[in-house]
């Protein structure tokens, strides 16, 4: 078999070399000519996989190492009999770490207690649902908006209008489709509560970037964190300058999440081809640089929360790197956006951390477990 794959997918040889030859290409540049003789196509979100790319090719399986599928033409896949798989939940923990790290950074800058805010999570799928679980585990107030889940399950969901009216912090985790494009348009952005924080780590076009750029100079009370941008890899330089944190679509870029994504499409490919799985992620995932921390039972819980989160991930570094890249002409900035993603430094997830508490401190132990770390 012949495999065409995005060059930035990790562990391609380890998982797929036994299937056949692998041709690695830049994801944004994969063309119809490249895939004409391919049997398997492995991509990330930067590759639009549709009729124009695949018609006339031999491709019988498409795997994307991402949660989202808005870059895949699933209707065409069904018509053409092409099997496919995404990697649901692969980077959910990494995105949650990003959101929590961003909240703690804003709280420190603004001099507020993050536990005193009311959180609104828009979209409660793999990522948003995990974020809701963590925030509630910390004992923080959370409202959740997810119309599809509300229609299917009923339960404790609220409208988007209530999120905007009642929440100080709004974190967006919706897929991108016709119903969510510019979900936060000029009207909804203007309706945000005084001093609200808006975090978008889903898809850039869920927020109207032009409307947000126009609004922020008039509403300096609003604090915005953007990891995703309309028109990627071209980010809006003026908008980035108005954000408290700005990063190049790396919220879910933990090493664990990347490798998990490759493993999930490998498993799906084995199922489609009727082949046994011969490789396990557990045997390929390296030990983390930091695996254990020790704290005293007298430690302040707020300090413990910030220290554990930042020991694993601190978004301020990515923000600084991204801002330094926003120079030169448009071509240079686009290249820098992709370069930051391609050469992203190793980052692990907080649930791989073990925390040793010296003494009896049930409150601290509960906090550590709510974060997803283990106590010893």
Swiss-Prot record:
GO terms for biological process: 'de novo' pyridoxal 5'-phosphate biosynthetic process; pyridoxine biosynthetic process. This is Erythronate-4-phosphate dehydrogenase. Keywords: Cytoplasm, NAD, Oxidoreductase, Pyridoxine biosynthesis. Its main location: cytoplasm. PANTHER family: FORMATE DEHYDROGENASE 1. NAD(+) binds at residues 126-127, 146, 174, 201-203, 227, 252. Catalyzes the oxidation of erythronate-4-phosphate to 3-hydroxy-2-oxo-4-phosphonooxybutanoate. GO terms for molecular function: 4-phosphoerythronate dehydrogenase activity; NAD binding; protein dimerization activity. Substrate binds at residues 45, 66, 253. It comes from Ectopseudomonas mendocina (strain ymp).
């Amino acid at each position: 078999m012949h495999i065409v794959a995005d060059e930035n997918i990790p562990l391609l040889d380890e998982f797929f070399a036994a299937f056949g030859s692998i041709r690695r290409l830049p994801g944004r540049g994969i063309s119809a000519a490249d895939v004409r003789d391919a049997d398997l196509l492995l991509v990330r979100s930067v590759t639009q996989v549709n009729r124009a790319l695949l018609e006339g090719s031999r491709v019988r399986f498409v795997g994307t190492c991402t949660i989202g599928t808005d870059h895949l033409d699933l209707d065409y896949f069904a018509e053409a009999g092409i099997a496919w798989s995404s990697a649901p939940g692969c980077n959910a923990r990494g995105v949650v770490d990003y959101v929590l790290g961003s909240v703690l950074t804003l709280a420190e800058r603004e001099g507020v207690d993050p536990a005193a805010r009311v959180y609104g999570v828009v979209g409660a799928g793999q990522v948003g649902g995990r974020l809701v679980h963590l925030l509630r585990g910390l004992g923080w107030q959370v409202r959740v908006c997810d119309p599809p889940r509300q229609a299917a399950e009923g339960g404790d969901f609220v409208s988007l209008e209530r999120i905007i009216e009642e929440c100080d912090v709004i974190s967006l985790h919706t897929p991108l489709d016709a119903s969510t494009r510019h979900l936060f348009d000029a009207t909804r952005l203007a309706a945000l509560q005084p001093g609200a924080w808006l975090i978008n780590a889903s898809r850039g076009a869920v927020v109207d970037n032009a409307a947000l750029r126009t609004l922020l100079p008039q509403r300096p009370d609003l604090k915005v964190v953007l990891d995703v941008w309309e028109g990627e890899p071209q980010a809006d330089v003026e908008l980035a300058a108005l954000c408290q944190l700005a990063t190049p679509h790396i919220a879910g870029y933990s090493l664990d999440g990347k490798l998990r994504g490759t493993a999930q499409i490998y498993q799906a490919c084995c199922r489609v081809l009727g082949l046994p799985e011969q490789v396990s992620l557990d045997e390929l995932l390296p030990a983390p640089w930091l695996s254990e921390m020790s704290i005293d039972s007298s430690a302040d819980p707020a300090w413990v929360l910030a220290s554990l989160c930042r020991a694993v991930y601190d978004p301020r570094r990515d923000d600084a790197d991204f801002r330094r890249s926003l120079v030169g002409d448009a071509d240079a900035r686009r290249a820098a956006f992709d370069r930051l993603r391609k050469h992203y430094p190793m980052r692990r997830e907080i649930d791989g951390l073990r925390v040793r508490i010296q003494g009896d401190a049930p409150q601290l132990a509960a906090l550590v477990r709510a974060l997803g770390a283990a106590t010893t």
